[in-house]
């Protein structure tokens, strides 16, 4: 009998970080996510149940409705829903055996004792998670100028401390916290916080998703109590990732077309590969938006409010095409409206990268 390694995902989003771990044979016990659409996406993909907190120590099961591009759901699933999910592959041999608790609430209101009630006597091997990066990213023109204010003063930046709090209470064998490279500006403070909860070794592992088969560029830092240096793989181009979707109909979930803003429609045919309609100023760099992708190159970094134009067609990428750029399998679904789906995808960890990290951790825990 194979014993599955067990993990918790804090700030789980739609499940990109968890997807890589599940594909590598890990079992999610609990996931916490404030956004309702993202929480439903997570439950949908990993056969979970969604709870919300009604008072200290007491939770209720949520009844949710969802939409994933071609199929409406109610929760829990009815027989026809389950048949469709099995046919698509969302409920496959790995996921149908899972039953994570998805807490749809503010992590600041969740105590480790409440998490322990859900997991009962199961031991948590790993805690993963990606606290929001807005407080640290150079793309945010309003981030605090003093790096330490980003960690200790900024409301969003302080969520890193909530991650550390729960890690300290549950004491997993390994923790992995994802964020933008800007978080290294408070490296000393974060190391101090982790050492205070019992983790002497703290590594800031900088990884590029494209080094592990992801079709878009993404450089992120993974703070952990182990060194993470996965074996690199062959890069994949935009057209290799999304080319076949030009010939697939709407039976592919989340493959719905979003309209280009009216001001771009008459000019879109003139936009060359790699060019953008607009540029916006971050804290320390200029970023393009509505970018025509080059078919034979990597896509630029996928973000929640960043849109791409198809290399050969004068339209925006669909959420499914955008998900392919983050190496999601087509059986991973995104619940909610089309804008919500774009946001969920852009704010997640690319699956190819999360899977590479999971392999390193699995080897470490042997």
UniProtKB/Swiss-Prot annotation:
InterPro entries cross-referenced by the UniProt entry: C5-Methyltransferase (IPR050390), C5_MeTfrase (IPR001525), SAM-dependent_MTases_sf (IPR029063)
Keywords from the named record: DNA-binding, Methyltransferase, Restriction system, S-adenosyl-L-methionine, Transferase
Gene3D superfamilies on file: DNA Methylase, subunit A, domain 2 (3.90.120.10), Vaccinia Virus protein VP39 (3.40.50.150)
GO molecular function: DNA (cytosine-5-)-methyltransferase activity; DNA binding
Active-site residues from the entry: 133
Stretches assigned to the SAM-dependent MTase C5-type domain: 5-366
Entry's EC annotation: 2.1.1.37
Alphabetized Pfam families for the sequence: DNA_methylase (PF00145)
UniProt record similarity statement: Belongs to the class I-like SAM-binding methyltransferase superfamily. C5-methyltransferase family.
Function, in words: A putative methylase that probably protects DNA from cleavage by the MjaORF1200P endonuclease.
Protein name: Putative type II methyltransferase M.MjaORF1200P
Lineage: Archaea, Methanobacteriati, Methanobacteriota, Methanomada group, Methanococci
